[in-house]
Amino acid sequence: LAVFRPSENRWYVQSSSSGKVRTFDLGSAGTDLLLPADYTGDGKADAAVYRNGVWHLIDSDTGEHESFESGFDDGRPVPADLDRDGRIEFAVFRKGTWYVYDGSSLVSHKFGLEDDHPLGPVPVRASLPGR
């Protein structure tokens, strides 16, 4: 289980096996999109946010913070396991082109029209009223 507390810009994550709660800071309320998913392929969700074309990730096992660019300010993040290997790829849709970073390289693929909206997981803004 996990929650993001906007007033503190802090994540609270409870281990399903031990019940222990871990906290860490990642993201900014109102500006970042929260995109937790299993980016490392270990079967556990990693905390991730997308801000202005930059992904920020905290590995659920190591606690290490990684940041990298794989999109554009006006791109829409659509993380998904596109190659079905058990790891979520960092994908961004922008003006009819998909940009996918698989952990080692960034590839692009033209699919869709400039005004299309990508289908996939819905990113959540960190500024949810009353939560």
Residue ranges and their predicted role:
Residues 1-131:
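Trp/Gly-enriched beta-strand/coil motifs that build multi-repeat beta-propeller-like domains
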